[in-house]
Curated annotation (Swiss-Prot):
InterPro entries linked: EFTu-like_2, EFTU-type, Hint_dom_C, Hint_dom_N, Hint_dom_sf, Homing_endonucl, INTEIN, Intein_C
Protein family (similarity comment): Belongs to the TRAFAC class translation factor GTPase superfamily. Classic translation factor GTPase family. IF-2 subfamily.
Domain of life per record: Archaea
GO cellular component, one term: cytoplasm
One GO process term, biological-process aspect: translational initiation
Species per Swiss-Prot/TrEMBL record: Thermococcus kodakarensis (strain ATCC BAA-918 / JCM 12380 / KOD1) (Pyrococcus kodakaraensis (strain KOD1))
Gene: infB
Name by which UniProt lists this protein: Probable translation initiation factor IF-2
DOD-type homing endonuclease domain sequence ranges: 232-362
Any further remark recorded for this protein: The intein interrupts the GTP-binding site.
Pfam families in the cross-refs: GTP_EFTU, GTP_EFTU_D2, GTP_EFTU_D4, IF-2, Intein_splicing, LAGLIDADG_3
Posttranslational modification: This protein undergoes a protein self splicing that involves a post-translational excision of the intervening region (intein) followed by peptide ligation.
CDD domains registered for this protein in UniProt: aeIF5B_II, Hint, IF2_aeIF5B_IV, IF2_eIF5B
Record's function text: Function in general translation initiation by promoting the binding of the formylmethionine-tRNA to ribosomes. Seems to function along with eIF-2.
Length: 1144
């Protein structure tokens, strides 16, 4: 068979771009923390990962609102927050009647024409804003926040009466009054962890210790109490002054009467022209509680009110009551404009209020002048306001109903091109859609449809065209229909009586019915989750200082209520910006880019001559993985699909956790690699010449810059040495088989890219020639990079072919969920050179065959359950099909585990990453019950729950690079099943191991708290050591063996119970424990000296069988030699009555 050299497959790992940043004062909202500036977020993160003069990266682990690749908003953990020095231009992007955000020029925004850099935005562009921002819904987190706020020096708290007797021993001498009068400061409560026992509170300065408050207010506990308090807070923010409420509405008064549940009375007082509502019985305590929890201002309320953090940390059921109180007091319904409006002297308050309303999906508008006005308009927003907040004031509630009826439109969605694409895909002419949606034609060109209209359009399109067969016949020329021909000409399907390329493509799509409801789902998700607001102004300014950003898996997050994005080495090689055209996907998926050798020669220029000998490779095939996690998908027969890898390391940041993980994976797969030390342009004073070879560029640098580069390179070389690699700058490497080559580059400006390409090509040819020789005519073998829905094609697979030739009429065998899928290729689609499989700028080229190495998209029936990372084998006979099925099944079965035994549940995004994670767990001795590919489902959680009942530490789900389904999250929260997700394998396992350790310590602490330890004591024989004979008896004792604690029962030699130790005193101090050798006084409740106990008598701590079992099995390490002696002595006593104790 003919053999030839194929192009090498190059994987690019570890690129992280820190160039896209925001000003320090831009705000994000953390569900568990509320609004916080990026600088504040950075200060919150304490563990520094990397730091130098230019930047600092810290571990974060906080949750943020992001947009997933399906267009839906969700909460995701952000692993890092960082700051970088910036000197130069910044842009403030201001959205019309919304917020503004200041970013570096390269920071992208999601617009209706895809992701667009800030410096390419223009007024009138529509930018994405989230419809919803997630706040906290956990009652537990809310209550802990309240307790934190109550740590106030003026707090005086009264505890529940039944607790006082239990804690009296803690308050002796001059502190006994606290228990007697039931008055405690926050330090007392914190020390004894009594927050849950606080019943009533008041506030008085410490300097007035002699004074005491007249009235306390009940600390809210029940939903009813919190709702009454939050409504009152809302009214105060609207109509309140320092001690009264100016409000005429009787309904507000009726609502405020509900404060009686907190022990506060209200009365309505008629003044000359209006009514006032006054608080009595606990007014001062209630107002002070308001100031503490809601940061309510003491003076100049109008200008100084701000939205307090509690409104983002409290569950929505309480926040809605605050908002109702506020809008009842200050809101106005304008029937003329069909809108709700509220005006304030505090612009900042209303700006934050607009973000708070996003917790309910309400998108408002902000009009700024001397006073700021917030407006809620549009049918969808008004309807959500009515559903979640509403008015108690009758005339406002009635006006709202009328405003909703009058309001017919919600936000507009200017997605003209998408609508045309969907219409043609489903086989409609403009005229046909006009009958479903009047004046439809204008929505494709001049007028953006409202949300309601868009939903009607999508519903109509989704039903499909009833005359599709006739249209197919017209395009095929079998039928002549003048109206259709005219419509097709207008849509560009026919020109001069012939089918255009678009017409031919569409005909194929219609014939095969290659469209379904999933084609409209993405647009529907965008409309449900996002709103697009026009850019009003872009202001340019100079800035010197730190800029900030956070890392998320999806490379986007919400800042100042606006969606912002972080994205790429390959962009420079392609001379095209991927982020600019990612309108639909948002996250960067695995892509493949073919670089013909002519392009390499053009970019590398004269450097080729330095490489002695001709480069025979046809080109390079780059696989651009968004991180180490995707590399695990590139598996082929247990090894790596990649022939060579480029590990991108930021020369300024050095090694990151991802870098270490990437190196470990490369080592595991035995993949040769070279290092691209990126961002040399960030070295102070570096002279930049775009696309210049590094060896030319370095000659233009001054000595200081060269020295800094050398220092950073030596730091990298040292790190590689620690990991077992000899590394050096590429031009100093003597033997490429023994030394790791480091190429200093600037991906941003193209410096060093020529050397990188020459090195990749030269090393591949010199050292991998035998591996790259393929049988051209042999059946193809490949690996699935990604399974994805394509408009007009259905489910497709993006595949890297690494051996043989794949033909368009081949039968292929593909790895599926738990089976081998056999299917016939319907279409082979290959991107043009210098483009990406996943998102080509131009339409795919249909090809008859592809020869390795190549990236190809395969359209074929039955691919819905295909697995990323699994093999693809072409088979040309029944025998080959059977052989391929067996090979694929054995590969899947070697990775997918289902033992049914006690062990953890493991889920991963691809077969390769599942293999890597499972291997790591097994090496650490962590048993696996089930390992499978896919998101974490409710079934996974239920299976982990069944494990938890037998062995709690294994009753967990570990997920690598996967999402948690909503129902799975609900069940996990309800049943207490821990779910660990992450995108760094070793970090995921570390987190799990840390949890196991913490759980074991927690369990041990719980056992220690509840178990009774053995102890043997002897009363002193001298009567002088009998301090009281009864109620309680107080006697001096010596601990002979073991230990004693308050609360234990004592027994005699006969086994008879004599009483309970109430307290233990060692000299002048009450203690919680006395051990062997201690001489102490003990108070025994229930015993009388001379009747039940006698001087010189030996007594034993009474133990239950359960105590012994726990001590022997679970707390063996906690037992000292003296405890074991005491246990044996006690067992001897108890064995007289029960034979169980003889075995102890």
């Amino acid at each position: 068979m003919t053999k030839r050299i194929r192009q090498p497959i190059i994987a690019v790992l570890g690129h992280v771009d820190h160039g896209k940043c925001l000003l320090p004062d831009e705000k994000v909202i953390l569900p568990e923390h509320g609004p916080i500036t990026l600088k504040g977020l950075f200060d919150l993160a304490k563990e520094t990962v990397v730091a130098d003069n230019e930047k600092e990266i810290r571990k974060l682990g906080a949750k943020l609102t992001i947009v997933g690749e399906d267009g839906r908003l969700r909460v995701l953990e952000s692993p890092y927050v960082w700051k970088v020095r910036h000197r130069g231009k910044m842009l403030r992007v201001k959205l019309k009647n919304w917020h503004s955000v200041s970013v570096t020029p390269e920071h992208p925004f999601l617009t209706t024409r895809g992701w667009v850099r800030a410096d390419q935005l223009k007024p009138g562009d529509y930018v994405a804003v989230p419809r919803v921002i997630h706040g906290n819904e956990s009652d537990e987190r809310f209550v802990s926040f309240v307790y934190e706020k109550l740590k106030n020096d003026e707090l005086i708290a009264k505890l529940r009466g039944e607790v006082l007797s239990k804690i009296s021993s803690e308050f002796k001498g001059d502190r006994a009054y606290k228990v007697e009068r039931n008055v405690f400061r926050w330090e007392d409560i914190e020390r004894l962890n009594l927050w849950d026992e606080v019943e009533r509170v008041a506030f008085t300065p410490r300097m007035h210790r002699s004074g005491k408050p007249l009235h306390y207010v009940k600390l809210p506990r029940s939903p009813e109490e919190w709702e009454a308090f939050f409504y009152f807070a809302g009214v105060m923010f609207g109509d309140g002054s320092q001690d009264k409420i100016a409000n005429n509405d009787v309904e507000v008064y009726e609502e405020l009467k509900k404060l009686s549940v907190l022990g506060v009375a209200v009365k309505r007082v008629e003044r000359t022209t209006s009514y006032e509502i006054e608080l009595t019985n606990g007014k001062n305590a209630l107002l002070r509680l308001l100031r503490v929890l809601f940061e309510y201002p003491e003076r100049q309320k109008a200008k100084s009110i701000r939205v307090p953090r509690i409104l983002f940390i409290a569950p929505r059921k309480y926040v809605s009551r605050f908002l109702r109180g506020y809008f009842d007091a200050d809101g106005h319904v304008s029937l003329k404009d069909a809108r709700i409006e509220v005006t304030s002297a505090s612009q900042e308050f209303l700006e934050d209020l607009s973000l708070l309303l996003l917790r309910f999906g309400i998108v408002s508008k902000i009009y700024r002048s001397d006073y700021t006005t917030l407006v809620i308009s549009g049918r969808r927003n008004l309807d959500l306001f009515r559903r979640y907040i509403g008015f108690s004031v009758k005339n406002k509630a009635e006006a709202l109903e009328k405003a909703i009826k009058k309001s017919r439109r919600s936000e507009s969605y200017p997605i003209f091109e998408e609508l045309k694409r969907l219409r043609l895909l489903f086989g409609f002419t403009r005229t046909e859609l006009n009958s479903n949606v009047p004046f439809y034609g204008k929505y494709e060109s001049e007028e953006a449809p409202s949300y309601e209209t868009l939903m009607r359009i999508l519903d109509a399109i989704e039903k499909g065209s009833i005359n599709l067969d006739k249209k197919i016949a017209v395009l095929e020329g079998r039928i002549r229909d003048h109206n259709y021909i005219k419509a097709f000409e207008k849509d560009g399907l026919i020109k001069d009586g012939k089918l255009t390329e678009l017409g031919r493509e569409l005909l194929e799509v219609w014939r095969n019915r290659e469209f379904d409801s999933s084609d409209v789902d993405y647009i529907r998700n965008l409309a449900e989750n996002l709103v697009f607001i026009p850019v009003e102004d872009i202001e340019e300014f100079e800035y010197e200082g730190y800029v900030y950003d956070v890392t998320t898996e999806t490379h986007n997050f919400v800042a100042n209520g606006i969606l912002v994005h972080n994205t790429t080495l390959l962009d420079r090689i392609r001379h095209t910006n991927v982020a600019g055209k990612e309108a639909g996907g948002i996250t960067q998926h695995i892509g493949a880019t073919e670089v013909p050798i002519d392009v390499v020669k053009q970019l590398a220029g004269p450097l080729i001559k330095l490489w002695k000998g001709e480069i025979k490779l046809p080109g390079l095939l780059f696989i651009d993985t968004p991180g180490h996690e995707a590399f695990t998908s590139l598996r082929a027969r247990g090894g790596s699909l990649a022939d060579l890898a480029v590990l991108v390391v930021d020369i300024n940041e050095g090694f990151q956790p991802q870098t270490i993980e990437s190196i470990e994976i490369l080592r595991r797969y035995r993949t040769p690699f070279i290092v691209a030390a990126n961002k040399i342009d960030r070295i102070k004073g570096w002279v930049i010449e775009e696309d210049e070879p590094f060896l030319v560029n370095i000659k233009k640098q001054d000595q200081r810059a060269i020295q800094e580069l050398e220092t950073k390179l030596w730091e990298l070389i040292g790190k590689f040495y620690e990991m077992g690699f000899n590394a050096n700058r590429f031009d100093r490497v003597q033997d490429f088989t023994r030394e790791l080559a480091i190429v200093p580059i600037s991906a941003k400006y193209g410096i060093g890219i020529p050397e990188l390409l020459v090195l990749i090509a030269g090393l591949s040819q010199k050292y991998l020639e035998e591996k790259l020789k393929i049988e051209v005519e042999g059946p193809a073998r490949g690996t699935i990079l990604e399974v994805r829905e394509e408009v007009g094609l259905g489910t497709t697979i993006d595949v890297i072919i690494y051996d043989g030739t794949l033909r368009k009429d081949d039968t292929i065998v593909v790895g599926g969920k738990d089976k081998a899928i056999v299917t016939k290729i319907r279409a082979l689609l290959k991107p043009k050179p210098l483009d990406e499989i996943r998102d080509p700028r131009f339409r795919f080229d249909q090809v008859d065959e592809v020869t390795a190495a190549a990236g190809v998209k395969i359209a074929a029936p039955g691919l819905e359950e295909a697995l990323a990372g699994s093999p693809v084998i072409a088979a040309r006979s029944e025998e080959e099909i059977e052989k391929a099925k067996q090979e694929i099944l054995s590969q899947i079965q070697s990775v997918v585990i289902n033992t049914g035994k006690i062990g953890v549940i493991v889920k991963a995004d691809t077969l390769g990453s599942l293999e890597a994670l499972s291997k790591e767990l097994q090496e650490k001795g962590i048993p696996i019950r089930k390992a499978d590919v896919g998101n974490i489902s409710k079934t996974d959680v239920m299976e982990a729950l069944s494990v938890k009942e037998e062995e709690p530490k294994y009753g967990v789900v570990l997920g690598f690079n996967v999402k948690v389904n909503e129902d799975a999250e609900e069940v996990a929260n309800a049943k207490g099943v821990p779910i660990f997700v992450g995108n760094i394998i070793y970090k995921l396992i570390e987190d799990y191991e840390a949890w196991v350790k913490e759980e074991e310590e927690k369990r041990k602490r719980e056992l220690l708290k509840n178990v009774t330890f053995p102890g043997v004591i002897r009363l002193y024989p001298d009567e002088r050591y009998v301090f009281r004979r009864s109620k309680p008896a107080i006697v001096g004792v010596e601990v002979l063996e073991g230990r004693i604690r308050p609360g234990v029962t004592l027994i005699k030699e006969t086994g008879e119970k004599v009483g309970v130790i109430k307290s233990i005193k060692n000299k002048n101090d009450f203690v919680q424990e006395a051990k062997k050798g201690d001489a102490v006084a003990i108070a025994i409740e229930g015993a009388i000296v001379g009747r039940h106990i006698h001087p010189g008598e030996t007594l034993y701590v009474d133990l239950s069988k359960n105590d012994v079992i726990i001590l022997a099995k679970q707390l063996k390490d906690e037992l000292e030699e003296t405890d074991i002696k005491a246990l044996k002595m006690t067992a001897k006593v108890k064995a007289k009555e029960d034979p169980f104790w003889r075995a102890v």
